[in-house]
Amino acid sequence: MRRAACPGSFDPITNGHLDIIVRASRLFDEVVVAVSINKNKVTLFTVDERMELIREALRDHPMAPSNVLVDASHGLIVDFCRSRGIQSIVKGLRAVSDFDYELQMAQMNNSLAGVETLFMSTNPQYAFLSSSLVKEVARYGGDVSGLVPDVVLKQLRERLAQ
């Protein structure tokens, strides 16, 4: 079985993330969205909230893939992959600047555990999109409705209103 991990913090998941996950689901028998837990990073949503938002966004997606799982990832992504028999990592690239960092990570992951990384170019309509940018725009009252799944938009508005 060809299995891949799509790692990230997904705080929150964006339509750009969703696009990469759905496209990866067509290339692999199973895709595991690995929601990273970084105790040094302050997140808007807890890991459980992020995982549930991803599950709901996938269920609501018009091309709802049935071969995507969502799980929490502690520590190195290669350890996550190794413990689950995952051979590949899928990463979306928005710009050339992403490639420099991601190439180093891919080479390190391959040297540590023989895990291959597949780079997918981001759909041009999402090339500028990041979770950080979504949160910043939303905090200042900007409209992010076309940038995140509806379920995320609702939770984002509620969280920022607190």
Swiss-Prot record:
GO annotation, biological process: coenzyme A biosynthetic process
Cofactor(s) listed in the protein's UniProt record: Mg(2+)
UniProt keyword ATP-binding present: yes
Pathway it works in: Cofactor biosynthesis; coenzyme A biosynthesis; CoA from (R)-pantothenate: step 4/5
Family matches, as Gene3D superfamilies: HUPs
Site residues by UniProt (Transition state stabilizer): 17
InterPro entries to which the protein is assigned, alphabetical: Cyt_trans-like (IPR004821), PPAT (IPR001980), Rossmann-like_a/b/a_fold (IPR014729)
Keywords on record: ATP-binding, Coenzyme A biosynthesis, Cytoplasm, Magnesium, Nucleotide-binding, Nucleotidyltransferase, Transferase
EC number: 2.7.7.3
GO cellular component, one term: cytoplasm
Known catalytic reactions: (R)-4'-phosphopantetheine + ATP + H(+) = 3'-dephospho-CoA + diphosphate
Compartments reported by the entry: Cytoplasm
Binding-site residues, ATP: 9-10, 17, 92-94, 102, 126-132
Any GO MF annotation of the entry: pantetheine-phosphate adenylyltransferase activity
Family per record: Belongs to the bacterial CoaD family.
Assembly: Homohexamer.
HAMAP family: PPAT_bact (MF_00151)
Protein name in UniProt: Phosphopantetheine adenylyltransferase
Organism listed in the record: Frankia casuarinae (strain DSM 45818 / CECT 9043 / HFP020203 / CcI3)
